[in-house]
């Protein structure tokens, strides 16, 4: 239970230490934030997908919107817009599910990291797909987005 919190704290501490270094370039900084975002999204997905999660069938009934096209960091605005509904859904099962008890912390971390990556501007109007996705698909697609962005930055 505390190992997830410790891992999250260690990862955040490493990001903060790395970001305080004067030699850090903006691209390297963005990559580090993306790596932190990736970790937080993966932790949420692990908690939801846990084979002992009795609430998974209920969680899969809630639907989320994905952007039509998410290829740039500015598209993280679309993720941010769905964090409120995601938080609400996870709160429904959090009290009785030990695997999701840190969901609020992960959502807060994701919100802060997204703000750092996309900036404070809310100029992008998200164009969402007409079809909705489950919470598992939602997190999986954003994980793929982060992995793709990190891969692009390291080339």
Swiss-Prot record:
UniProt subcellular location? Secreted
Q: Which UniProt keywords apply?
A: Adaptive immunity, Cytokine, Disulfide bond, Glycoprotein, Growth factor, Immunity, Secreted, Signal
Q: Which GO terms describe its biological process?
A: adaptive immune response
| Keyword Disulfide bond found | yes
Name the domain of life.
Answer: Eukaryota
Q: Which residues form the signal peptide?
A: 1-20
Tell me where it mainly resides: secreted
Disulfide bridge partners, by residue number: 78-126
Q: Which residues are glycosylated?
A: 23
Supply the InterPro entries for this chain: 4_helix_cytokine-like_core (IPR009079), IL-2 (IPR000779), IL-2_CS (IPR030477)
* Pfam families listed in its UniProt record: IL2
Among the GO molecular function terms of this UniProt record, one is: interleukin-2 receptor binding
Q: A GO CC term? A: extracellular space
State the family it belongs to: Belongs to the IL-2 family.
| UniProt function note | Cytokine produced by activated CD4-positive helper T-cells and to a lesser extend activated CD8-positive T-cells and natural killer (NK) cells that plays pivotal roles in the immune response and tolerance. Binds to a receptor complex composed of either the high-affinity trimeric IL-2R (IL2RA/CD25, IL2RB/CD122 and IL2RG/CD132) or the low-affinity dimeric IL-2R (IL2RB and IL2RG). Interaction with the receptor leads to oligomerization and conformation changes in the IL-2R subunits resulting in downstream signaling starting with phosphorylation of JAK1 and JAK3.
Name of the molecule in the record: Interleukin-2
Protein source organism = Meriones unguiculatus (Mongolian jird)
Identify the taxonomic lineage of the organism of origin.
Answer: Eukaryota, Metazoa, Chordata, Craniata, Vertebrata
């Amino acid at each position: 239970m505390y190992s997830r919190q410790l891992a999250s704290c260690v990862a955040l501490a490493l990001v903060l230490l790395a970001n305080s270094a004067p030699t850090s370039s903006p691209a390297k900084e963005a990559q580090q934030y993306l790596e932190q975002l990736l970790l937080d999204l993966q932790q949420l997905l692990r908690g939801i997908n846990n084979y002992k999660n009795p609430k998974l069938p209920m969680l899969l009934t809630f639907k989320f919107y994905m952007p039509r096209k998410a290829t740039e960091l500015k598209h993280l605005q679309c993720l941010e817009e769905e964090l409120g509904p995601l938080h609400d859904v996870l709160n429904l099962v959090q009290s009785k599910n030990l695997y999701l008890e840190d969901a609020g912390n992960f959502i807060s971390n994701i919100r802060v990291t997204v703000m750092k990556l996309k900036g404070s501007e809310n100029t992008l109007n998200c164009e969402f797909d007409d079809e909705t996705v489950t919470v598992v698909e939602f997190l999986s697609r954003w994980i793929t987005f982060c992995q793709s962005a990190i891969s692009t930055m390291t080339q």
